[in-house]
């Protein structure tokens, strides 16, 4: 699987959680799945997402969706 295909797969899975209203697991899924591919492991967006969530900046579905869709 290419890097781009893997990122698309990660986004799809994470957005399923967003659609269900489960924002914590959306972010956890994205981070966990990104770490499963050698070219996306330790992606800087993982730490950024955690910081944003801890400071209340990923508290709505729209905020989380924008964050997840921004990964590349």
Model-derived segments and spans:
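Alpha-helical linker/edge segments of TPR/alpha-solenoid repeat scaffolds
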Residues: 52-72
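Short, flexible helical or helix-coil boundary motifs
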Residues: 17, 21, 34-41, 57, ...
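N-terminal acidic leader/helix
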Residues: 1-31
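Short, charge-rich amphipathic alpha-helical segments embedded
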Residues: 28-53
């Amino acid at each position: 699987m290419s890097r781009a295909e893997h990122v698309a797969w990660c986004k799809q899975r994470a957005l399923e959680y967003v659609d269900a209203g489960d924002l914590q697991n959306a972010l956890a899924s994205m981070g966990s799945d990104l770490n499963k591919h050698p070219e996306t492991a330790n992606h800087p967006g993982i730490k950024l997402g955690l910081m944003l969530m801890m400071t209340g900046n990923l508290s709505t579905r729209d905020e989380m969706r924008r964050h997840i869709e921004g990964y590349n």
